[in-house]
């Protein structure tokens, strides 16, 4: 994959500082947030998915930045795109640094740093915050009214796409905290709330894109997912954690997708006229890896690859044609 135009295009956009787009978390350009391009952490994770060599210069440069984000360094510059928010509202500082550390931890865990003491320390701290939430009554009633809106309880610290990705990529942490991992798996298997909600960040109300209050997969009665890339990403995380069996919607969607595989294991649904589209930007790093969708075979590649990877994570025997 490292020679692909897709990976080369990602590398080309990296600055000498090790960052991308002048920001950390941006999943797409956002003039309102001052984000001109996709940020450092999504692009770093995308390079990992594209199998760019870990010893390469892009990772060496970015690793320095990510490990610094895990530290207790209070340098305002490390807030990147959230710096303006915190400057105008200092109460938002704790939230900003927490989300940045979670995202950086996910990226470093996926990069193979699971046993690095710096990441282990951050990982256990993140896991402890989630564990405290899961054990509290707030986990069952996580919302409060805030004027006309529904807001997340101020004491709620639910898992996020970042923290779950980190935990999924840290097998020893999961073994050391087996009880927590099981509680988290059951929590992630329940349906996510349907109603939109906001979180209070300092004096502002923000619509969160990163939090997971249950299984986010939406599927019809036949098991077809509304957002196939998001469904596969979530199923893959649950499979890594050994929690897929507890998630009824996720298992139903996986079964439906597998039904569309032919005798050689290739995902080939009828009348596939276009590549499944990602509706949620959270899967930017994950999908698509194969951009050529001009042929039927090209449209099948990504989903086939993900289904094979999930099968491998589940311990299934794969026969390659």
Q: What are the roles of these predicted feature ranges?
A:
Residues 1-321:
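Preference for long, amphipathic alpha-helical scaffolds in soluble/luminal domains
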């Amino acid at each position: 994959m490292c020679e692909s135009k897709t990976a080369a295009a990602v590398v080309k956009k990296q600055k000498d500082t090790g960052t991308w787009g002048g920001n950390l978390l941006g999943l797409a350009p956002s003039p309102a947030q001052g984000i001109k391009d996709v940020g450092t952490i999504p692009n770093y994770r995308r390079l990992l998915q594209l199998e760019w060599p870990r010893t390469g210069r892009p990772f060496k440069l970015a690793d320095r930045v990510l490990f610094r984000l895990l530290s207790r360094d209070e340098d305002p510059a490390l807030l990147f795109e959230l710096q303006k928010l915190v400057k105008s509202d200092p109460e938002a500082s704790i939230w900003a640094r927490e989300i940045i550390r979670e995202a950086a931890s996910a990226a470093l865990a996926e990069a193979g740093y699971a046993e690095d003491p710096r990441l282990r320390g951050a990982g256990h701290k993140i896991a402890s915050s989630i564990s405290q939430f899961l054990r509290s009554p707030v986990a069952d009633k996580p919302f409060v009214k805030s004027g006309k809106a529904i807001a997340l309880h101020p004491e709620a610290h639910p898992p996020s796409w970042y923290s779950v990705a980190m935990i999924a990529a840290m097998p020893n942490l999961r073994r050391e905290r087996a009880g927590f991992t099981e509680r988290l798996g059951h929590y992630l298997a329940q349906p996510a709330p349907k109603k939109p909600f906001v979180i209070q960040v300092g004096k502002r109300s923000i619509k969160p894109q990163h939090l997971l209050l249950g299984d986010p997969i939406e599927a019809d009665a036949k098991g077809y997912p509304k957002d196939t890339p998001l469904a596969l990403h979530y199923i893959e995380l649950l499979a890594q954690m050994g929690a897929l069996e507890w998630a009824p919607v996720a298992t139903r969607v996986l079964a439906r997708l597998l039904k569309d595989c032919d005798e050689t294991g290739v995902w080939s649904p009828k009348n596939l006229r276009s590549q499944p589209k990602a509706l949620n930007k959270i899967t930017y790093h994950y999908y698509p890896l194969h951009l050529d969708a001009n042929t039927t075979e090209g449209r099948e590649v990504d989903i086939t690859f993900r289904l094979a990877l999930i099968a491998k994570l589940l311990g299934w025997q794969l026969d390659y044609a």
